[in-house]
């Protein structure tokens, strides 16, 4: 499969690859990801027990979520198309003495293998690929019957634009400028429609809210900006 056939935005891939060496710096450019990671883990554990489960972390980056899942007892495979991020993830896991199967691999290739997973996580990735529906379909093909899939992304509305682009990238400098493209944001209704067309059933949608005075994130009923969704394949 050539790069042009893969569900990859080369500019997005290069942008995040350039952040590889700063990935595990909690005060660096990936600080928001460090702040949001405990909330993602909390949400997953509200939906399913991790211990002993086979988990696929799609778009694992430098391994923030993969390591958290492994520390909570999951058997984790992390895939990402960035070689530099996979190298960072492997090195950090080795330092932490964690056994995580990291692969620089296209998820579409994995669908041709026999292995299926109890849990699939695809966090902060859908808004960075050319065809998010195709990504969801591939995730659905890799889940076991009764397994759970978790997606997190950003709603598409004026409030989300103000918070995640104007606020986070330009006013408060929480993220590097150009991290997000508003046109790539995804409404919950769109995510649900794409997932259902891939044979998935929605179990829950929960928002993520940022408290600027506390400088922390938490789960919320408000899905107008960042949100998490849990689906199952029956």
From Swiss-Prot:
Pathway: Cofactor biosynthesis; ubiquinone biosynthesis. InterPro entries: SAM-dependent_MTases_sf, UbiG_MeTrfase. Its EC number is 2.1.1.222, 2.1.1.64. S-adenosyl-L-methionine binds at residues 40, 59, 80, 123. Keywords: Methyltransferase, S-adenosyl-L-methionine, Transferase, Ubiquinone biosynthesis. The keyword DNA repair does not apply. GO terms for molecular function: 2-polyprenyl-6-hydroxyphenol methylase activity; 3-demethylubiquinol 3-O-methyltransferase activity; methyltransferase activity; polyprenyldihydroxybenzoate methyltransferase activity. It catalyses: a 3-demethylubiquinol + S-adenosyl-L-methionine = a ubiquinol + S-adenosyl-L-homocysteine + H(+); a 3-(all-trans-polyprenyl)benzene-1,2-diol + S-adenosyl-L-methionine = a 2-methoxy-6-(all-trans-polyprenyl)phenol + S-adenosyl-L-homocysteine + H(+). The keyword Transcription does not apply. It comes from the Bacteria. GO terms for biological process: methylation. Belongs to the methyltransferase superfamily. UbiG/COQ3 family. O-methyltransferase that catalyzes the 2 O-methylation steps in the ubiquinone biosynthetic pathway. NCBIfam families: UbiG (TIGR01983). This is Ubiquinone biosynthesis O-methyltransferase. The lineage of its organism: Bacteria, Pseudomonadati, Pseudomonadota, Gammaproteobacteria, Legionellales. The gene is ubiG.
């Amino acid at each position: 499969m050539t790069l042009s056939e893969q569900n990859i935005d080369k500019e997005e891939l290069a942008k995040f690859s350039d952040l590889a060496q700063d990935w595990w710096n909690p005060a660096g450019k990936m600080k928001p990801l460090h702040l949001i990671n405990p909330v993602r883990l909390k949400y997953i554990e509200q939906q399913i027990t991790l211990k002993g489960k086979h988990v696929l972390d799609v778009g694992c980056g430098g391994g923030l979520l993969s390591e958290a899942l492994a520390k909570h007892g999951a058997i984790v495979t992390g895939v990402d198309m960035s070689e530099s991020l996979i190298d960072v993830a492997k090195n950090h896991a080795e330092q932490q003495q964690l056994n995580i199967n990291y692969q620089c691999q296209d998820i579409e290739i994995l669908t041709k293998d026999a292995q299926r997973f109890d849990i699939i996580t695809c966090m902060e990735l859908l808004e960075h690929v050319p065809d998010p529906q195709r990504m969801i379909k591939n995730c659905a093909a890799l889940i076991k019957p009764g397994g759970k899939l978790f997606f997190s992304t950003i709603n598409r509305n004026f409030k989300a634009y103000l918070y995640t682009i104007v606020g986070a990238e330009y006013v408060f400098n929480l993220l590097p400028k150009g991290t997000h493209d508003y046109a790539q944001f995804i409404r919950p209704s769109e995510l649900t429609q794409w997932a259902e067309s891939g044979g998935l059933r929605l179990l829950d949608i929960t928002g993520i809210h940022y408290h600027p005075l506390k400088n922390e994130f938490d789960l919320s009923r408000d899905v107008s900006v960042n949100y998490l969704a849990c689906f199952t394949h029956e």
